[in-house]
C-alpha cells in the first residue's frame, strides 16, 4: 500500500521526503540569488508570492538568515532541481535558470497560510518536450487570458507553447503596417 503524502504538487515530483516543521514566509524573507542569471526567475516567483500573500519578497545577492536561497551548480540534468525546505529556510539548487524556475514553481505550490512544509524535493521531467496548444484561430482570447494561460503552463512546468494563430485568411494579431 502506497503512503499518501501531505505534500501535493502538480506535476508530481520524482522524489518527496517530508520532514517535521515548517518555514514561515514573511514580508522580511529575502530571495538570495547566487548568480545574476537567477534574477528573472526570482522576480517571477516574487510576483507570484505577492499575489498569494500581499507582500513582495526582496531579491538580494547578500546571504541572509531565514531566506530562500537559489544556487546554480553544475552536474544536474537539464531542468532537474533539488529543493530543501527546513524551519530555517529554503535552498534550491539546479544547473540552469529554467530548472530554478521549475523549482520555484514547485515552491509556489507549497506556500500556505501555515508556512512552507519542511521537505526535500528532487525533480526532473520525464519528457524533454512538454507542450500545450492554444487555438486562437477559432475563438478570440483577450491578451490577459493568454498571459494567464502561459503562467499556468509555467506553473505546471510545460516547456513548449504552441500558439495556433490562424487556419485560413483570418488573422488575429493586429499589424499596424498592413490593413
What residue ranges belong to the model's regions?
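A mature extracytoplasmic/lumenal domain signature
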Residues: 37, 138, 165-167
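Conserved strand-to-helix beginnings and helix N-cap segments that scaffold or border functional pockets
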Residues: 42-43, 143-147
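Residue-level signal for secondary-structure boundary sites
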Residues: 39, 100, 140-142, 171
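Contiguous, structured surface segment used for ligand recognition
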Residues: 1-130
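Aromatic- and acidic-residue-enriched carbohydrate-binding clefts of CAZyme catalytic domains
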Residues: 169-179
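Catalytic domains of carbohydrate-active enzymes, especially glycoside hydrolases
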Residues: 145-168
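Mid-sequence acidic-hydrophobic segments that form the walls
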Residues: 107-110, 135, 140, 152, ...
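The substrate-binding groove and active-site-proximal loops of carbohydrate-active enzymes
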Residues: 93-94, 130-143
